[in-house]
Amino acid sequence: MIASVRGVVTATGPDHAVIEVGGVGLAVQCAPGTIADLRVGQPARLATSLVVREDSLTLYGFADDNAKALFELLQTASGVGPRLAQAVLAVHTPETVRAAIANADTAALTRVPGIGKKGAERLVLELRDRIGPVPVGGDGAAGVTTGAWPEQVRQALVGLGWTAGQAEQAVAAVAETVDGEVPPVPVLLRQAIRLLGRTR
């Protein structure tokens, strides 16, 4: 199993990054918040989880081992595969997910595209006793503020399945709320997803 990768970022997209390790470029599937912290040409380390299927080998990457552990735990619930587990971490921080499951906050879980009320209830039922300690206070978001945040958020939303038009409207709405210091990209992304969730 490939537990982590360290190397130079050679490319990024809405849902993946390419990390060059020993002359080999590894395509790593990542949540938008993780990609937002990567810079092409700069070194990076990602905790990784290798998902093996009959016809594919897919490497998923995370900012830290906490997110990776939650990704793997989510997949032990009925009906949750790697793509849905990754979508959960695209919408919420690991701390928020743990709190939502521990507190049976199905409303927070249904903000994730692909999770309905029954799916959220199933996650709570199956994982509540295994979710681990829930941190108190803060949402755990972290990121590097850049002037290019609108494009980063727009690309991330399209990568999560919304149309370019929907992404544009959400970015415009979020931009109106930004006053002074710009929050980290993952925070802005979650705000945009919440706005889009209300209009679905």
Swiss-Prot record:
Region (Domain II): 64-142
InterPro entries for this protein: DNA_helicase_Holl-junc_RuvA_I, Hlx-hairpin-Hlx_DNA-bd_motif, NA-bd_OB-fold, RuvA, RuvA_2-like, RuvA_C, RuvA_C_sf
Region (Domain I): 1-63
Flexible linker: annotated span: 143-151
GO molecular function: ATP binding; four-way junction DNA binding; four-way junction helicase activity
Tagged with keyword Membrane: no
One GO cellular component term: Holliday junction helicase complex
Localization of this protein: Cytoplasm
Alphabetized UniProt keyword annotations: Cytoplasm, DNA damage, DNA recombination, DNA repair, DNA-binding
Region named Domain III: 151-200
One GO-annotated biological process of the protein: DNA recombination
SUPFAM superfamilies to which the protein is assigned, alphabetical: DNA helicase RuvA subunit, C-terminal domain, Nucleic acid-binding proteins, RuvA domain 2-like
Domain remark text: Has three domains with a flexible linker between the domains II and III and assumes an 'L' shape. Domain III is highly mobile and contacts RuvB.
Protein family: Belongs to the RuvA family.
Protein role: The RuvA-RuvB-RuvC complex processes Holliday junction (HJ) DNA during genetic recombination and DNA repair, while the RuvA-RuvB complex plays an important role in the rescue of blocked DNA replication forks via replication fork reversal (RFR). RuvA specifically binds to HJ cruciform DNA, conferring on it an open structure. The RuvB hexamer acts as an ATP-dependent pump, pulling dsDNA into and through the RuvAB complex. HJ branch migration allows RuvC to scan DNA until it finds its consensus sequence, where it cleaves and resolves the cruciform DNA.
SUBUNIT field: Homotetramer. Forms an RuvA(8)-RuvB(12)-Holliday junction (HJ) complex. HJ DNA is sandwiched between 2 RuvA tetramers; dsDNA enters through RuvA and exits via RuvB. An RuvB hexamer assembles on each DNA strand where it exits the tetramer. Each RuvB hexamer is contacted by two RuvA subunits (via domain III) on 2 adjacent RuvB subunits; this complex drives branch migration. In the full resolvosome a probable DNA-RuvA(4)-RuvB(12)-RuvC(2) complex forms which resolves the HJ.
Alphabetized HAMAP family for the sequence: DNA_HJ_migration_RuvA
Name of this protein: Holliday junction branch migration complex subunit RuvA
Organism whose genome encodes this protein: Salinispora arenicola (strain CNS-205)
